């Protein structure tokens, strides 16, 4: 079988599970940013791979703000510790209020809170209506237990956004971790469905 036909037979259509944004978005978005925010909201579960300088932070904040307003509930952003305070400051510039999430606090209403990955076990995922993972490329470098903890945390949250400026689109491990967090399919399912072994001697060698 030709590989093009192999892929075609494996294809499936993802059904949008999100919502439509208002006609006017109250953020200083560039022309290329606004369609991406609208697309991510419409998808419900989406990934934004935007290179450095393309405005990943404002897009994820706009998405989080729209989810919070649409659901009337809180959205949590997971980010590396050094990025958390930067994101709060960026939000101030764009008129989007972001608070540091304190363990034990009560979260309600259309609010956006942020914490670092290491604190995730201190929060209840059922409280949140949306989740953003920033610098999501680090998922593939995390130990299995921590990566699974983040994936499991997001599974009960309806709206999910994965953001990174440094994706490795040819790294099937990264594709798998991103797809698994978004609830599309597990890494094992992805490898079984879309990758074939080339028959060589190298263990684990696979081709798309």
What is each of the regions a protein language model found here?
Residues 7-49:
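Conserved pre-motif I regulatory segment
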Residues 43-63, 136:
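Walker A/P-loop
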Residues 72-74, 93, 130, 147-205:
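Conserved P-loop NTPase motor "coupling/switch" region that bridges the ATPase
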Residues 107-122, 163:
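Conserved two-lobed SF2 helicase motor
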Residues 124-126, 136-151, 172:
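Conserved ATPase-coupling elements of RecA-like P-loop NTPase cores
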């Amino acid at each position: 079988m030709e590989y093009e036909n192999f892929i075609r037979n494996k294809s499936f259509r993802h059904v949008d599970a999100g919502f439509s944004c208002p006609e006017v978005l109250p953020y200083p978005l560039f022309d290329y940013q606004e369609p991406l925010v609208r697309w991510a909201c419409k998808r419900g579960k989406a990934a934004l791979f935007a290179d450095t300088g393309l405005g990943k932070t404002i897009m994820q904040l706009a998405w989080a703000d729209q989810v919070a307003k649409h659901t009337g509930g809180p959205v949590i952003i997971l980010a590396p510790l050094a990025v958390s305070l930067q994101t709060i400051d960026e939000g101030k510039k764009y008129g989007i209020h972001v608070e540091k999430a304190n363990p034990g606090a009560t979260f309600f209403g259309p609010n956006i809170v942020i914490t670092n990955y290491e604190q995730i076990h201190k929060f209840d995922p059922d409280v949140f209506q949306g989740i953003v993972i920033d610098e999501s490329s680090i998922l593939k470098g995390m130990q299995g237990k921590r990566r699974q903890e983040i994936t499991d945390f997001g599974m009960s949250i309806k709206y999910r956004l994965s953001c990174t400026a440094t994706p490795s689109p040819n790294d099937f491990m990264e594709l798998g971790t991103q797809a698994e967090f978004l609830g599309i399919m597990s890494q094992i399912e992805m490898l079984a469905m879309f990758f074939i072994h080339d028959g060589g001697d190298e263990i684990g060698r696979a081709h798309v």
